[in-house]
């Protein structure tokens, strides 16, 4: 992505110079580790600021009062590590759960270098989700269909945690499928990075209808 586009993303987010420098460091780390760990689609590295950074930053605007975040299947730290970097000055803390040990190595090293308030957990989601009660927001990007996301996050969504799940053009079909099993209170927020994408914001979840 060109420098003017980088500047546009940073200006729109309204981040400080120090935060911009930390995001630059994250991008440098992503490019350095990509050939070894295959963290993101190779073609997206040329659009890293719009495809990844801005896509993550928009979640902060949807929960401006949230301080504790849980990112599931963190992978390359999108959105979780980016949220930690950008939210650092407002007191945000993010837990990153990732089952791939190699990706956890990237997350741990990059969190250290950027001084991001993030804790990396090398574990399977279903094994640890119960430990994160009271979290303000749980999020996951490009991880699983809505039915599976709701199954994993049920203990949190039923007790006041908000869910933010970026989705693509098939979001309505995913919600229809999930609706056969769950009573979900949600709204769809248009993505500012993709006209066909939506962010599913879940504010309440009831038990599956067959229980």
From Swiss-Prot:
<protein>
    <recommendedName>
        <fullName>Ribosomal RNA small subunit methyltransferase G</fullName>
        <ecNumber>2.1.1.170</ecNumber>
    </recommendedName>
</protein>
<dbReference type="Pfam" id="PF02527">
    <property type="entry name" value="GidB"/>
</dbReference>
<dbReference type="GO" id="GO:0070043">
    <property type="term" value="F:rRNA (guanine-N7-)-methyltransferase activity"/>
</dbReference>
<dbReference type="InterPro" id="IPR003682">
    <property type="entry name" value="rRNA_ssu_MeTfrase_G"/>
</dbReference>
<dbReference type="GO" id="GO:0005829">
    <property type="term" value="C:cytosol"/>
</dbReference>
<keyword id="KW-0808">Transferase</keyword>
<dbReference type="InterPro" id="IPR029063">
    <property type="entry name" value="SAM-dependent_MTases_sf"/>
</dbReference>
<keyword id="KW-0963">Cytoplasm</keyword>
<feature type="binding site">
    <location>
        <begin position="125"/>
        <end position="126"/>
    </location>
    <ligand>
        <name>S-adenosyl-L-methionine</name>
    </ligand>
</feature>
<feature type="binding site">
    <location>
        <position position="73"/>
    </location>
    <ligand>
        <name>S-adenosyl-L-methionine</name>
    </ligand>
</feature>
<feature type="binding site">
    <location>
        <position position="141"/>
    </location>
    <ligand>
        <name>S-adenosyl-L-methionine</name>
    </ligand>
</feature>
<comment type="function">
    <text>Specifically methylates the N7 position of guanine in position 527 of 16S rRNA.</text>
</comment>
<keyword id="KW-0489">Methyltransferase</keyword>
<comment type="similarity">
    <text>Belongs to the methyltransferase superfamily. RNA methyltransferase RsmG family.</text>
</comment>
<keyword id="KW-0698">rRNA processing</keyword>
<keyword id="KW-0949">S-adenosyl-L-methionine</keyword>
């Amino acid at each position: 992505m060109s420098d003017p586009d980088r500047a546009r993303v940073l200006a729109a987010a309204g981040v400080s110079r120090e935060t911009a420098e930390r995001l630059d460091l994250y991008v440098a780390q992503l490019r350095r580790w990509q050939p070894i760990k295959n963290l993101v689609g190779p073609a997206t590295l040329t659009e890293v600021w719009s495809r990844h950074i801005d896509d993550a930053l928009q979640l902060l605007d949807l929960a401006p009062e949230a301080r504790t975040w849980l990112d599931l299947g963190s992978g390359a730290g999108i959105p979780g590590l980016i949220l930690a970097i950008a939210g650092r000055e407002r007191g945000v803390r993010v837990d990153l759960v990732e089952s791939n040990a190699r990706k956890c190595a990237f997350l741990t090293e990059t969190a250290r270098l950027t001084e991001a308030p993030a804790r990396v957990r090398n574990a399977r989601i279903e094994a640890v989700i119960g430990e994160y009660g009271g979290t303000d927001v749980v999020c996951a990007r490009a991880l699983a269909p809505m039915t599976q996301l709701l199954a994993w996050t049920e203990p949190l969504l039923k007790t006041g945690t908000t869910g933010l799940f970026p989705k693509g053009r098939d979001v309505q079909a995913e919600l229809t499928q999930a609706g056969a099993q769950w009573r979900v209170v949600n709204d769809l927020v248009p993505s500012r990075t993709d006209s066909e994408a939506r962010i599913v914001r879940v504010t309440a979840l009831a038990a599956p209808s067959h229980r």
